[in-house]
């Protein structure tokens, strides 16, 4: 299963970007034996729409397009799965998150898209299409830190699925 991260906004050079790249590199190396291929990060420009509703709709359109491209030609069990990061989402532990990623892979999903929304959050239509709306705890995180956290959790999920001792429960 190809795993992509879609993030609204750019991450500038600096220590945060280096840390994100380090964890995504680890995930890219740990994933293939488990059937998880890291396909990279797609940065979506922040919308300049006049209202929050318009901005969310414009940002969601690009994620919809990626999902449609992944699902074209697929069956209901194939295609793409979507996880949205949202402070109002479900809070999971690392082992539960790893189990969900593993189940999506085992169910024959060809692609997993993890989407980090813009400052206004996600469009309601996109939220309703998501397979999982996930909160990274009850705190609100800047987008740069959310990227670091999901990069680390994807790597951790791969190590959990592999039985590697990185994760100590």
UniProtKB/Swiss-Prot annotation:
Gene3D superfamilies named in the record: 3.40.1280.10
Intracellular or extracellular location(s): Cytoplasm
Domain of life where this protein originates: Bacteria
Predominant location category: cytoplasm
Stretch forming the signal peptide: none
Statement: the UniProt record of this protein carries the keyword rRNA processing: yes
Annotated GO CC locations: cytoplasm
Binding sites annotated in the UniProt record for S-adenosyl-L-methionine: 85, 117, 136-141
Recorded GO MF terms: rRNA (pseudouridine-N3-)-methyltransferase activity
Reaction it catalyzes: pseudouridine(1915) in 23S rRNA + S-adenosyl-L-methionine = N(3)-methylpseudouridine(1915) in 23S rRNA + S-adenosyl-L-homocysteine + H(+)
Keyword set, alphabetical order: Cytoplasm, Methyltransferase, rRNA processing, S-adenosyl-L-methionine, Transferase
Record's keyword annotation contains Aminoacyl-tRNA synthetase: no
EC nos: 2.1.1.177
Enzyme class: transferase
Job description of the protein: Specifically methylates the pseudouridine at position 1915 (m3Psi1915) in 23S rRNA.
Similarity comment: Belongs to the RNA methyltransferase RlmH family.
Quaternary structure (record): Homodimer.
Descriptive protein name: Ribosomal RNA large subunit methyltransferase H
Lineage: Bacteria, Pseudomonadati, Pseudomonadota, Alphaproteobacteria, Hyphomicrobiales
């Amino acid at each position: 299963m190809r795993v992509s991260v879609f993030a609204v906004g750019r991450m500038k050079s600096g220590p945060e970007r280096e840390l994100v790249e380090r964890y995504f590199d680890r995930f890219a190396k740990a994933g293939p034996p488990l059937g998880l291929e890291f396909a990279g990060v797609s940065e979506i420009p922040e919308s300049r729409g006049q209202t929050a509703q318009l901005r969310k709709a414009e940002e969601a359109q690009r994620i919809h397009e990626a999902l449609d491209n992944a699902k074209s030609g697929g069956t209901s069990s194939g295609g793409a799965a979507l996880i949205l990061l949202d402070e109002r989402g479900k809070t999971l532990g690392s082992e539960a998150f790893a189990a969900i990623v593993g189940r999506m892979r085992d169910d024959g999903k060809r692609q997993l898209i993890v989407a980090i929304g813009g400052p206004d959050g996600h469009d309601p239509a996109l939220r309703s299409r998501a397979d999982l709306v996930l909160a990274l705890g009850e705190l609100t995180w800047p987008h740069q830190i959310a990227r670091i956290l999901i990069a680390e959790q994807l790597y951790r999920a791969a190590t959990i699925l592999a039985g590697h001792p990185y994760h100590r429960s």
